[in-house]
C-alpha cells in the first residue's frame, strides 16, 4: 500500500513537473520568436529608426543570453534586460508613422512586444521551483519507507547475491524518480537537459544576418557602450 501510494504521488508530481518544464521551454521559444519578428517588422520604418530598433533588440537578446540566463539559475532577473526593454519602448514613441504601412507596422510591433513580454514573464516565473517543501518531504519519506519495506520483507536465509540487486533496484528507482522531479522543477539549471538560451542565440544570429553591417550600441554581453 505504501509503495503504491508513493508511486501514484511520484507519477503525479512528475506530470506536474513536466508541464512546468514544457511551459518554460515554450516561453523561451515564444520570446525569441517575438524578438525576431520585431526585428523583421523594423524594416518597414526609415533606415535610421530601423537600425536603432534592431540594435536595441540585439542588445536585449545578448543581455538575455549572457546576463539573465545565469541570473535565473539564482532565481533572479537582469536589470540590464529591463534597460534594453525601456530603450526600445522609448523608440516606439519616436517612430515615424505617417503612412498607413508605418501605422500598421507600429501596431504589429506593439503586439509582438506584448508577446515578448508574456514569454519573458513566464520564463522568469518558471525559474522558481514550484514543488513546495512539504511535498518534497512527503516524496523523500515515501521513498525511504518503500525501500525500508522492501528490506523488511526479505528472507534472511536468502543469499545476499540475490537480495542485494533486488533492494538496490528498488532504491535506484526511488532515487531516479526523485532526480527526475528535481530536474523538471529546475528547468533552467545548467544540468544535462536544462533549457538553454538556444532559441535566443538563433534569433541573434538571424537578426545580425538581416543587416551584417549593423553595429549595436552594446558589448557581446549586452552592456551599453
Where are these regions (language model features)?
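Transmembrane signal-anchor/signal-peptide helices with a preference for the extracytoplasmic
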Residues: 5-29, 185
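Alpha-helical transmembrane anchor segments
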Residues: 128-219
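A near-ubiquitous, low-amplitude feature marking generic local secondary-structure context
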Residues: 14, 18, 40, 71, ...
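Structured inter-helical modules in multipass membrane proteins
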Residues: 23-25, 30, 36-128
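Solvent-exposed, non-transmembrane helices and loops of integral membrane proteins
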Residues: 39-61, 65, 189-225
Amino acid at each position: 500500500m505504501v509503495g503504491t501510494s508513493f508511486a501514484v504521488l511520484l507519477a503525479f508530481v512528475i506530470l506536474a513537473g513536466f508541464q512546468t518544464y514544457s511551459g518554460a521551454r515554450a516561453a523561451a521559444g515564444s520570446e525569441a520568436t517575438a524578438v525576431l519578428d520585431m526585428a523583421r517588422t523594423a524594416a518597414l520604418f526609415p533606415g535610421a529608426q530601423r537600425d536603432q530598433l534592431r540594435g536595441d533588440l540585439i542588445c536585449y537578446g545578448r543581455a538575455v543570453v549572457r546576463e539573465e540566463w545565469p541570473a535565473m539559475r539564482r532565481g533572479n532577473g537582469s536589470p540590464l534586460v529591463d534597460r534594453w526593454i525601456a530603450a526600445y519602448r522609448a523608440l516606439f514613441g519616436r517612430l515615424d508613422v505617417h503612412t498607413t504601412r508605418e501605422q500598421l507596422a507600429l501596431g504589429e510591433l506593439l503586439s509582438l512586444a506584448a508577446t515578448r513580454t508574456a514569454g519573458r514573464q513566464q520564463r522568469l516565473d518558471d525559474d522558481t521551483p514550484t514543488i513546495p517543501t512539504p511535498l518534497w518531504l512527503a516524496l523523500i519519506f515515501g521513498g525511504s519507507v518503500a525501500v525500508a519495506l522492501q528490506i523488511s520483507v526479505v528472507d534472511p536465509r536468502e543469499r545476499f547475491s540475490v537480495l542485494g540487486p533486488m533492494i538496490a533496484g528498488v532504491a535506484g528507482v526511488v532515487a531516479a524518480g526523485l532526480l527526475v522531479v528535481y530536474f523538471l522543477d529546475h528547468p533552467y539549471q545548467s544540468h544535462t537537459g536544462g533549457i538553454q538560451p538556444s532559441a535566443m542565440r538563433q534569433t541573434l544570429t538571424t537578426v545580425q544576418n538581416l543587416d551584417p553591417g549593423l553595429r549595436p550600441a552594446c558589448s557581446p554581453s549586452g552592456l551599453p557602450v
